Amino acid sequence: MTSYLTVYDESAVKALCTTRANETKAWQSMALLDTQVNVQQALIDAAQFGIRYVLLGICEDIGPRANLGNKGAQHAWPAFLKRFLNQPHNQFIATQKVLLLGEVNTTDLMLQSNQLSAKQPEQLTQLRELCRQLDERVEAVLSLIFKAGLEPIVIGGGHNNCLGIIRALSKHSQNPINAINLDPHADFRPCEGRHSGNGFTYAYNEQHLNSYHVIGLHELKNNQATLDAMAQANHSFTSYQAIAVRREITLSSAVTHALNGTDNYALGIEVDLDSITYMPVSAYNCSGFSVADAEHFVHVAASNRRAKYLHLCEAAPDQHPNGLDIGAEHAGQVLSALTNSYLQAKEQ
């Protein structure tokens, strides 16, 4: 449903954009959707005119809060835009193939969620119901993008939004999909009501998820029930300790091996920003990967011909110890770097 989508026009992003003499910025080379045409048809037209990638934001922290986590993930998308739109456009990045679509409508759900506390059992149930409603909106919007043959780069919000993306791609391809996730957590908690910690569980139980591999799973940040559930579903992981502590395998080899072990279904690339050390996120991490490691993960995964989307989630700028403004600058830089890594890998 297009009512679940706010389509951006020039006025929506003008305040974020800067100019400089003798320099073309990314925003000056990117496309916006024709708002005079039906959204689905406009996306199809965009693909025919050479657009390949679609930027989509989700401004919510309902999922993380419904998972007993911290607030702030709603600020990741604007932080990304301010940075990405104003980077230079040059021979190394194909921003002319990128469409800035807009954002999933979350305002009404966020207003309701702001009145709720996860510490109260009844209100926690309500938060999880709002998360379920958000799933429907994400799926509806992503379905439009996949139907047009375009590749979404989805930014902001919690990891709960993986479910809507996976549902949409699975239904479009008429097959379950494979997913590879850079994350200290498996996000394979029980189906106890929707939140950011069980999107992959729901996707698997609904038969939308075929093979699921977690890169960088922290051996001491996942409970035994989650590890048992992963094993029972024949999903797999390469732990943070195996890669970074015991050095049993390199990050490159871990990603390549995981992808070689899957069949020919569509592939989703997931990055939980919790995986990166000192990121302002909903679950702060002092022992994670570097930004360069995360960029490399995206590069290797996106180089796979079956990769169909990139999902960057859980950045929460206002969790930065120096406040929202510094956190937005930090998150914006990292989200832009990961997006650039995807685009460059796809165009190599």
Regions found by a protein language model. Name each.
Residues L220-A231:
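Short, glycine/polar-rich helix-capping loops at beta-to-alpha or helix-loop-helix junctions
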Residues R194-S196, L217-N222, I249-S253, S290:
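A general structural motif
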Residues E136-R137, L142, F146-I215, N222, ...:
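Active-site histidine-anchored catalytic micro-motif
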Residues T2-I153, N161-C162, K171-Q174, A229-Q348:
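Catalytic cores of soluble, metal-dependent hydrolases
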Residues F188, L220-K221, A244-R247:
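Short, small-residue-enriched loops and turns at beta-alpha junctions
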